[in-house]
Amino acid sequence: MMKKRVKRVLFKISGEALSDGDSSNRISEERLSRLIAELKVVRNADVEVALVIGGGNILRGLSQSQSLQINRVSADQMGMLATLINGMALADALKTEDVPNLLTSTLSCPQLAELYNPQKASDALSQGKVVICTMGAGAPYLTTDTGAALRACELKVDVLLKATMHVDGVYDQDPRECADAVRYDHISYRDFLSQGLGAIDPAAISLCMEAGIPIKMFSFARHSLEEAVFNTVGTVISSTEGGQL
């Protein structure tokens, strides 16, 4: 169990968490309902909740750039738009469940979302609203991980929780390719960077290291958001011995 009282968290949720894998069903009703229900549980535990949503269920900028010969900048911008689509779905679903929320965009889309402002977002969190951050870092060549780390620093969260669908933490090798890969329960920021581990963008690690914000990477396929916040699951990346948050 975490020893530190967790008051404010930021989830980085992959777009794949909203998809059931069917190419014709980019946003699954079942997956969306599960995510909304679990966000409600965490919020009802008196935790302030922000989240950064990916767009990989709709489009991956780098992959599209390579496969369709689209300019990298344009492809990344298309990927950012995909995160806004997912964010709009989340905002409406939360509203349907009477969960107050603020949908924000790093880039200006005034008819669709409020332009992200750190102070307004922080105030909304203090008021009990779920803050949804879309458009990643707002610039090409920067990953959604980096965008999540930026938001985590600006909002002064207690922990950044990265939910994935394929692995349950940070390994010394890719567990999908190496059967003898070993998962870390805890690893320091510096060891993560020096070993060149690829589970999280190194720019995101560096930002969180400077701000002293621990990162927990866990499997959303195996664990609930509540478990990720309050229990010992996945891998903790921090400077604290033993990974206690």
Swiss-Prot record:
Inhibited by UTP. GO terms for cellular component: cytoplasm. Its EC number is 2.7.4.22. One of its GO terms (biological process) is 'de novo' CTP biosynthetic process. It catalyses: UMP + ATP = UDP + ADP. SUPFAM superfamilies: Carbamate kinase-like (SSF53633). Keywords: ATP-binding, Cytoplasm, Kinase, Nucleotide-binding, Pyrimidine biosynthesis, Transferase. UMP binds at G55, D76, A137, G138, A139, P140, Y141, L142, T143, T144. The keyword Kinase applies. ATP binds at K12, I13, S14, G15, G56, R60, T164, Y171, D174. It is found in: Cytoplasm. GO terms for molecular function: ATP binding; UMP kinase activity. Pathway: Pyrimidine metabolism; CTP biosynthesis via de novo pathway; UDP from UMP (UMPK route): step 1/1. It comes from the Bacteria. PANTHER family: URIDYLATE KINASE, URIDYLATE KINASE PUMPKIN, CHLOROPLASTIC. Homohexamer. Belongs to the UMP kinase family. NCBIfam families: pyrH_bact. Catalyzes the reversible phosphorylation of UMP to UDP. This is Uridylate kinase. It comes from Chlamydia trachomatis serovar D (strain ATCC VR-885 / DSM 19411 / UW-3/Cx).
